[in-house]
Amino acid sequence: MGLVLDLLEWRRTARTLLDTYLGRGPGHEVLNGAIRRGDRRDLEAVILFADLRDYTASAASWSVDQLLAALDAYYQALVDAITVAGGEVLKFMGDGLLAVFPIGPPGTLALTCQRALAAAVAARNALAAANRARIAAGAAPLEFGVALDVGRVVYGNIGGQGRLDFTVIGPAVNLVSRIEALCKPLGQPLLATAALARHVGDELAPVGAHRIRGLAEPVELFALAAVVAPARCSA
């Protein structure tokens, strides 16, 4: 009995560590043996990519403690919102974050899109609250851009024989990161594709078709209606 309890405790500890460092989905896959290079599965998902504004310039002038505090506040806002909405954070990349919201059985596409958008908005609101505390403490406020798309991705292990990474790859992943790069020049905190916008009602508004690096045709983009409408009224 003692050995069984020890094994159960070991598995709980391993699951906690894997979930913390890899995310719930990848942690579950690795714990259940999906650790070979090339292990993969295809899935339809909403892809979310976020990036902290002006990180490079700030990193050059902030102390290490200031930088870590900023990243912690930014990532905490995103991770909490994404997790509550049923998403999976897959990767932190400096000041970037990649997450997916897997689409379940037929009929759940619209709900998944709505949850992903709600997560992005909730993260924005959470960071606004954190910014009030930062400003009160004499620290600079933080802003981030986020992009959303829907597409089929490959979810699994990639890398070399001695080092693997559990992640998602595919055209939709590349597209969403390039769309996010347009948030700042377009003056929008959030941008989404038509593939996602059609499932969230009037929460998003069109902001035109824009050139995306690597694509031959412009891509129709949508932004938060609550942000677009006041901007148009004041134009």
Can you name each region flagged by the protein language model?
Residues 47, 97, 144-150, 221:
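A structural signal for short, well-ordered beta-strand segments
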Residues 20, 24, 123-126, 130, ...:
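Conserved, well-folded catalytic cores of nucleic-acid-processing
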Residues 182-235:
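Cytosolic regulatory/linker segments at or just downstream of nucleotide-handling modules
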Residues 1-42:
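Regulatory cytosolic signal-relay segments
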Residues 72-86, 103, 107-146, 171-180:
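Alpha-helical scaffold within the catalytic cores of cyclic-nucleotide enzymes
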Residues 100-111, 146-166, 183-186:
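Catalytic strand-loop-helix junctions within cyclic-nucleotide turnover domains
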Residues 34-118:
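Catalytic NTP-binding/metal-coordinating core of nucleotidyl cyclase/transferase enzymes
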Residues 149-150, 158-159, 171-194, 215:
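Catalytic/regulatory signature loops of cyclic-dinucleotide turnover enzymes
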